[in-house]
From Swiss-Prot:
The keyword Nucleotide-binding does not apply. Gene3D superfamilies: Methylpurine-DNA glycosylase (MPG) (3.10.300.10). NCBIfam families: 3mg, PRK00802.1-3. It comes from the Archaea. This is Putative 3-methyladenine DNA glycosylase. Belongs to the DNA glycosylase MPG family. One of its GO terms (biological process) is base-excision repair. PANTHER family: DNA-3-METHYLADENINE GLYCOSYLASE. Keywords: DNA damage, DNA repair, Hydrolase. Its EC number is 3.2.2.-. It comes from Methanoculleus marisnigri (strain ATCC 35101 / DSM 1498 / JR1).
Length: 192
């Protein structure tokens, strides 16, 4: 079941933690999906957030309604996918950093050129390549578009002690903020 709009319209840190265990699903000719095991929150006023200096053509989706995909390229190479959160105009989002592959493993392996399930989606660029997420999905609804976030059929009860909170990866601004969250014990995270 896809998540309601109200799920995304909450506090971004709360949404980030609650995304853990959910499924990121890309529906195309062959569906691919993975369980979200690692995320990072980017907040209003956060120097590391794309929204920090205001609205631009590149980041305008971040300022739009919650529950939409903010997809962008980094280094001209890798595509990253974020979940827009909070109130419209806030410029907040959650970066999906890693997935545990669950559906469409063969297609993910072909796209990534590896048979190792642990490295298929263990990073933001890896997971978008594995799921076939492209810039065409920027701004699409995560509730009824081809890219969706769904609650798992039998959601695990995530206790606070099963969520690791630490600093974000690969940034220089606001690098000390503990806004990265991952499932304790998951072998699919990008790094510990």
């Amino acid at each position: 079941m896809t998540l309601p709009a109200a799920f995304y319209e909450r506090d971004t840190v709360t949404v980030a933690k609650d995304l853990l265990g959910c499924l990121l699903v890309h529906r195309e000719e062959v569906t691919t999906a993975g369980r979200i095991v690692e995320v990072e929150a980017y907040l209003r006023g956060d120097p590391a957030a794309h929204s920090y200096r205001g609205t631009t053509k590149r980041n305008r989706v971040m300022f739009g309604p919650a529950g939409h995909a903010y997809v962008y390229r980094i280094y001209g190479l890798h595509t990253c996918v974020n979940v827009v959160t909070g109130t419209e105009g806030a410029g907040e989002a959650v970066l999906v950093r890693a997935l545990e592959p669950v559906v469409g493993l063969d297609l993910m392996q072909a796209r990534r050129g590896t048979d190792d399930p642990l490295s298929l989606a263990s990073g933001p660029g890896k997971l978008t390549q594995a799921l076939g997420i492209t810039m065409d999905l920027n701004g699409t609804s995560l509730r009824d578009g081809p890219l969706q976030v769904r609650s798992p059929a039998n959601p695990p009860e995530l206790q606070p002690e099963n969520i690791v909170q630490t600093t974000r990866v690969g940034i220089t601004k606001a690098a000390d903020l503990p806004l990265r969250f991952y499932l304790k014990g998951s072998r699919y995270v990008s790094r510990r």
